[in-house]
Amino acid sequence: MMLPSVIAPPAMYPSFLRPSSALSLPPALQSAFTTHSSFLVEDLLRISRPAAFMHRSIPSPSASPPATGVTTLNTTSSAVHVAMSTALAKRSSSPQTSISSDPNYLKFGVNAILASTTRNASPPPPVQGMNAKTFPFPCFDGSFHPFIRASYFPASSSAVPIPGTFAWPLTARGKPRRGMLRRAVFSDVQRKALEKMFQKQKYISKPDRKKLATKLGLKDSQVKIWFQNRRMKWRNSKERELLSSGGCREQTLPTKMNPNPDLSDVGKRFEHEAVLRESPRAPFCQSRGDHEFNADLHFKSPSISSKHSDFSESEDEEITVS
């Protein structure tokens, strides 16, 4: 049951439902406004939609008869559709000379613009054939903005496909960074062989280093790093010994005159130096200065110490690695 107050327009605000006389509307629409003006769905659809969308199916005879007001609205809407279609056909068939022959005709007036759009207008496509509105760029794509995080959008959402990780921080920027080397763990046999070679020569050459690495089953870089660390420990201990005996740190560093310093007998050399100062040559050495005397001992000591070390190591058994 339909209420009569809904069908009939209210008496207080008739101007809201009827168009003003200043607007130029087709006669079919004017008749529609004058006959039935209300907020019904039928009237709103009839005004907003073109005639192609307003075709309605005829109810079957087996169905229940509709109400009287609904039947009147259906017949009125069909009459309005027929009137609109005939008006459009007459306007399209009329020549342009009839419009342009009018003395009040303006080339860029409202009537001319509306007439041109009416002539060039094509029938609207069906709703099924209309495509969705596309954007010039994909919204919320992975490459749209790098700072969109997946925490703002659920990963299960199909409307907003956000990748789990972004590819831009994983791109290679030049050479890959070299990782830190793991600390090598040497066995007792390897450590003894390395220590024996270090007692022979503090600065091992490349061929000897490669032979030793192959013999011990190590890498060349591992042997090189072991010798560097061992020389640092040896130099620190000798510095403390030299400083306690009155020497200097420069005696432990390699120079052009002595590229391979060997200070394994620092204590013995300083004892020998004290004996020479107490000998009859002491006044002469004092007159020449202690610097020259120490330098002379510094240059002569490597040969003596190397002979002593070769003699002492010849008695030891050679360490072999299986």
Curated annotation (Swiss-Prot):
The lineage of its organism: Eukaryota, Metazoa, Chordata, Craniata, Vertebrata. The keyword Nucleus applies. Residues 179-238 bind DNA. The gene is dbx1b. One of its GO terms (biological process) is cell differentiation in spinal cord. This is Homeobox protein DBX1-B. SUPFAM superfamilies: Homeodomain-like (SSF46689). Belongs to the H2.0 homeobox family. Its main location: nucleus.
